Amino acid sequence: MLKAFKEFAVKGNALDMAVGVILGASFGTIVKSLVDDLIMPPIGLVLGGVDFSNLFVTLRDGAAPGPYASLAAAKQAGAVTLNVGVFANTVVSFTIVAFAVFLLVRGVNTLRERLEGPAAPKQQACPFCFSKIDVRATRCPHCTATIG
């Protein structure tokens, strides 16, 4: 049983999947930092100094009445908040990751098409009646001529 598990774990699919999950998590962390630290601060500055990580709407005050200076202060007071800024950061992060995955898949598909070459035709024209027939056919179903 241990030998079978070792063979499964070392084979390409399980190992490739593990590497993909680890790299995906690391890439997600990098994108989160990119959004939180490099993209959203200039956007917030252009929009009048808005700090997106602290952009929230208080739905119900907590133990201490609002307004709260930050999202952390609202959470500490037990307020119920709608975290609009955190959601905006998450949407931007998702968009970047989705676009990166799209580019990766598109590149892999293009490379695969170049390596495999054009697909073999599945149909041919009958040399007698010019009808489309399967390339494996030995007799034309339209004119009954023998092919081949």
From Swiss-Prot:
Any one Gene Ontology cellular component term annotated for this protein: plasma membrane
Main location: membrane
Single GO molecular function: mechanosensitive monoatomic ion channel activity
Its membrane topology: Multi-pass membrane protein
Coiled coil: none
Transmembrane segments: 15-35, 84-104
Compartments where found: Cell inner membrane
Record keywords, A-Z: Cell inner membrane, Cell membrane, Ion channel, Ion transport, Membrane, Transmembrane, Transmembrane helix, Transport
Family of this protein: Belongs to the MscL family.
Assembly notes: Homopentamer.
Protein name, entry field: Large-conductance mechanosensitive channel
Organism of this sequence: Nitratidesulfovibrio vulgaris (strain DSM 19637 / Miyazaki F)
